């Protein structure tokens, strides 16, 4: 029978000093021997997805203590990718994932906590906490802050839904008036919560459901809705149950590595492909799998992308549907339900509720005669009131969206495509692969061939797009922006946004060893591996080289003779794999990150082989 980890600090005369300190935090004799559960919060006033989390840690803590545990809360950092976008701040976004994972490990292991509730929400916070949870392998439940309500405004006598990306596009489009740009800006982000489309934050929070580490509705129920309070309360209650299953009953199925198995990672990837999730999720799933000791690679993603259909199109791929609409259609469970009917997910995976996926679908899938309580839960909708407060409204849709032909979530018979919303491309330009969000690519752009226009940084690419250097028909190549070369693998949302604002959104392709925001759409291919700084072929491309992209064939080829590439490689190796004439201040912290960073095909995690592992 495993003993409580916290017993190391609470039992024995030699731990008198530790107990004295625990007493100073409010613990009593009756608490020594109870599981100490870390409430890992991520409240910050910098990020709308986290601004409402301040009191939610204590909400969870009260439930933990009522259920027989001892709750101890601490906070992690949280970077807002939207605010950090387009300047040097974006260099810090992806590295913050590793810092979050390490800080959770440091706190939990230093104080010998027995279990965790992870209160996450935005882009790098959920994956950072997920990496830590699988690394430490003690009972855990994830509960996110929830998505933002979609913005709404009236343009051309029509009410349209908005999000952050709309504000960026309008602001960059010289044809849009100042008044209209400001109107969209003021309407795009109306409430607290993670940005309202199927961007990285919401994609990851949905994937925690498929991994079995969060409760139904975690990824889709609005931050503002009163029903979300119950998710937090239940998380506090259920984590105590999980802790007791492990420490009192020796039930190893309560541990995250026995929940997030290879089959669960395949379920999560199937969900991601079906719902057209952010390409960043590929990075984060690969990284999390390594922490879990699961053999899950780009080859698995490529295999699955060829057989899992795309069942959803959500913003930024369309303005029609946002996360509030996904929830109305039954949320993650409804998508998994469609995949389960086709045999595309593993029904025997387990979850933090203690059930199998098949059992969870029987109770929560809105297409399988659920209880009225479940129906009402998925009817939770937006109020349209600007607020930064959680649980501040209780509006409900008049009815669910059960239209599986043309609704938000489609059946396999009505899928947008039989091959899903993400694809892995390979070829001499990306020997270890690259990722494209096919859900955001128009059919006419699934194949593209054109001359390269090469930039050594995101900054010069933006300037080249806005000053007219980039022409229709070209393939924009942005390199030395990978995990090592950036460093930090910046998101390229501004280049893709400005291509659209300049009328080039469908006339150009973009290839990079950097990554893309979940808000990106169009023919945008990222995660090119190996990256330029690691000797990848993308570092050998020159202006005018012809690049041939064929998404249906999963190929991306640089049409340059091998002998020419070999000669270029000799020249680049002589000067070093680094950008020419790029002026960028890189801090010591970022240089340290770059030293250990691997390319995107490995999840951009640190290279353990450098430590002799």
From Swiss-Prot:
Its cofactor is [2Fe-2S] cluster; Mg(2+). It catalyses: (2R)-2,3-dihydroxy-3-methylbutanoate = 3-methyl-2-oxobutanoate + H2O; (2R,3R)-2,3-dihydroxy-3-methylpentanoate = (S)-3-methyl-2-oxopentanoate + H2O. One of its GO terms (biological process) is L-valine biosynthetic process. It is an enzyme of class 4 (lyase). Its EC number is 4.2.1.9. Pathway: Amino-acid biosynthesis; L-isoleucine biosynthesis; L-isoleucine from 2-oxobutanoate: step 3/4; Amino-acid biosynthesis; L-valine biosynthesis; L-valine from pyruvate: step 3/4. The keyword Metal-binding applies. Pfam families: ILV_EDD_C, ILVD_EDD_N. GO terms for molecular function: 2 iron, 2 sulfur cluster binding; dihydroxy-acid dehydratase activity; magnesium ion binding. The modification N6-carboxylysine is found at residue 124. [2Fe-2S] cluster binds at residues 122, 195. SUPFAM superfamilies: IlvD/EDD N-terminal domain-like, LeuD/IlvD-like. One of its GO terms (cellular component) is cytosol. It comes from the Bacteria. Mg(2+) binds at residues 81, 123-124, 491. The active site is at residue 517. The keyword Iron applies. Keywords: 2Fe-2S, Amino-acid biosynthesis, Branched-chain amino acid biosynthesis, Iron, Iron-sulfur, Lyase, Magnesium, Metal-binding. Binds 1 [2Fe-2S] cluster per subunit. This cluster acts as a Lewis acid cofactor. Belongs to the IlvD/Edd family. Functions in the biosynthesis of branched-chain amino acids. Catalyzes the dehydration of (2R,3R)-2,3-dihydroxy-3-methylpentanoate (2,3-dihydroxy-3-methylvalerate) into 2-oxo-3-methylpentanoate (2-oxo-3-methylvalerate) and of (2R)-2,3-dihydroxy-3-methylbutanoate (2,3-dihydroxyisovalerate) into 2-oxo-3-methylbutanoate (2-oxoisovalerate), the penultimate precursor to L-isoleucine and L-valine, respectively. Homodimer. This is Dihydroxy-acid dehydratase. The gene is ilvD.
């Amino acid at each position: 029978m495993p003993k409580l980890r916290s017993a190391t600090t609470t039992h024995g005369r030699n731990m008198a000093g530790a107990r004295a300190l625990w007493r100073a935090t409010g613990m009593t004799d009756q608490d020594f021997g109870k599981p100490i559960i870390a409430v890992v919060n991520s409240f910050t006033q910098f990020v709308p997805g986290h601004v409402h989390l301040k009191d939610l840690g204590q909400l969870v803590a009260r439930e933990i203590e009522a259920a027989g545990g001892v709750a101890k809360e601490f906070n992690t950092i949280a970077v807002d990718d939207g605010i950090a976008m387009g300047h040097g701040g974006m260099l810090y976004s992806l590295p913050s994932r590793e810092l979050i994972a390490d800080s959770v490990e440091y706190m939990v292991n230093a104080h010998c906590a027995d279990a965790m509730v992870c209160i996450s929400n935005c882009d790098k916070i959920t994956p950072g906490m997920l990496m830590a949870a699988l690394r430490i392998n003690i009972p855990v439940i994830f509960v996110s802050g929830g998505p933002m309500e979609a913005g709404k405004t009236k343009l051309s006598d029509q009410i349209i839904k908005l999000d952050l990306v709309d504000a960026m596009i309008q602001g960059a489009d010289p044809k849009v008036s100042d008044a209209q740009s400001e109107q969209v800006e003021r309407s795009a982000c109306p409430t607290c919560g993670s940005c309202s489309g199927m961007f990285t934050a919401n994609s990851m929070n949905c994937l925690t459901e498929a991994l079995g580490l969060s409760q139904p509705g975690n990824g889709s129920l609005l931050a503002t809705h009163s029903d979300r309070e119950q998710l937090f309360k239940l998380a506090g209650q259920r984590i105590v149950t999980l802790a007791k299953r492990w420490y009192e009953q020796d039930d190893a199925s309560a541990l995250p590595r026995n929940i997030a198995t290879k089959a669960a990672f395949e379920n999560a990837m199937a969900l991601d492909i079906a719902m057209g999730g952010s390409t960043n999720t590929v990075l984060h799933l690969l990284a999390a799998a390594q922490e879990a000791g699961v053999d899950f690679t780009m080859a698995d993603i490529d295999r699955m992308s060829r057989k899992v259909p795309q069942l959803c199109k959500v913003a930024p791929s369309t303005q029609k549907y946002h996360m509030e609409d996904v929830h109305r259609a039954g949320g993650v469970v409804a998508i998994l339900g469609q995949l389960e009917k086709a045999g595309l997910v593993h029904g025997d995976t387990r979850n933090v509720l203690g059930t199998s996926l098949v059992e969870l679908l029987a109770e929560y899938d809105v297409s399988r005669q659920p209880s009225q309580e479940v129906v009402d839960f998925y009817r939770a909708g937006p109020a349209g009131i600007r607020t930064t407060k959680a649980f501040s409204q209780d509006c409900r849709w008049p009815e669910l969206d059960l239209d599986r032909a043309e609704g938000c979530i489609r059946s396999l018979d009505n899928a947008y495509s039989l091959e899903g919303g993400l694809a892995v491309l390979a070829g001499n330009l990306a020997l270890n692969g690259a990722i494209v969000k096919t859900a955001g690519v128009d059919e006419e752009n699934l194949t593209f061939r054109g001359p390269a226009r090469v930039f050594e940084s995101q900054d010069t690419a933006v300037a080249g797009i806005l000053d007219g250097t980039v022409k229709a028909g070209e393939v924009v190549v942005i390199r030395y922006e990978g995990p090592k070369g950036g460093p930090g693998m910046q998101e390229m949302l501004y280049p893709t946004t400005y291509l659209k604002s300049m009328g080039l959104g469908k006339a150009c392709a973009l290839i990079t060893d950097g990554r893309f925001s979940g808000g990106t759409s169009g023919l945008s291919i990222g995660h090119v591996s190996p990256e330029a700084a690691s000797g990848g072929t993308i570092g050998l491309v020159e202006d005018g080289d012809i690049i041939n992209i064929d998404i249906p064939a999963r190929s991306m080829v640089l049409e340059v003779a091998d002998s020419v590439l070999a000669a270029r490689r000799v020249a680049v190796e002589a000067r070093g794999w680094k950008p020419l004439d790029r002026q960028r201040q890189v801090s010591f912290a970022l240089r340290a990150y770059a030293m250990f960073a691997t390319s995107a095909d490995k999840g951009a995690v640190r290279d353990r082989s450098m430590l002799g592992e």
